[in-house]
């Protein structure tokens, strides 16, 4: 049996749900969710991707802050900005766009983000919970979470089935395997 998954229709549905949830948070609790997207360097694809994320968040009513740094930014400078964002009560989530310039250690940068604000779910605490199969409310990388959401929306149950995951990256393949 073949199931055609309409990603665009599902994205439209999820965007509408998200926009409504954000509006309710603002109306009932005076809360406006906030995300900071941090980018270092001038990688064209990364600039487009982060701009699109920033614009989408704004359309959904989310406070989005785009922090751009030159390619020669020092690790200390970027860590100082992450520390500010960690302590900023208007920012609920932090995303550091990869790839980073070569002088920056992605592991050090990722580990500096508070686990609760780690959009990509790459902080060791979040990864540990995921790989230990702990249930709870902690960040998991967006792509694997989105894949599982798509399957659930179309009532596709993988229990007892064989599935192939191509790739074993820490951002997609490994988290998807754990989900």
Model-derived features with residue positions:
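Amphipathic, non-transmembrane alpha-helical secondary structure
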Residues: 12, 16-19, 79, 83, ...
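Phosphate/diphosphate ligand-binding glycine-rich loop within oxidoreductases
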Residues: 61-63, 67-140
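Positively charged, low-complexity intrinsically disordered leader regions
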Residues: 1-29
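Glycine-rich phosphate/diphosphate-binding loop of Rossmann-like nucleotide-binding domains
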Residues: 40-54, 138-179
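Short beta-strand segments enriched in small/hydrophobic residues
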Residues: 32-41
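Glycine-rich phosphate/diphosphate-binding loops that line cofactor/substrate pockets in enzymes
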Residues: 23-32, 84-89, 157-158
């Amino acid at each position: 049996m073949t199931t055609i998954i309409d990603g665009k229709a599902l994205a439209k549905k999820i965007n509408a749900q998200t926009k409504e949830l954000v509006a309710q948070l603002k109306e009932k609790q005076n809360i406006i969710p906030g995300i900071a997207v941090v980018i270092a360097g001038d990688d064209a694809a990364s600039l487009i991707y982060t701009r699109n994320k920033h614009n989408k968040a704004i359309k959904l009513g989310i406070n989005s802050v785009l922090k751009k740094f030159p390619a020669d930014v020092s690790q200390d400078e970027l860590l100082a900005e992450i520390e500010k964002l960690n302590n900023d009560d208007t920012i609920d989530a932090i995303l550091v766009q990869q790839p980073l310039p070569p002088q920056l250690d992605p592991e050090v940068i990722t580990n500096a983000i508070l686990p609760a604000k780690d959009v990509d779910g790459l902080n060791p605490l979040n990864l540990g919970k995921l790989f230990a199969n702990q249930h709870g409310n902690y960040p998991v990388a967006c792509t694997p979470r989105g894949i599982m959401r798509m399957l659930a929306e179309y009532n596709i149950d993988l229990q007892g089935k064989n599935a192939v995951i191509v790739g074993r990256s820490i951002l997609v393949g490994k988290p998807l395997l754990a989900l």
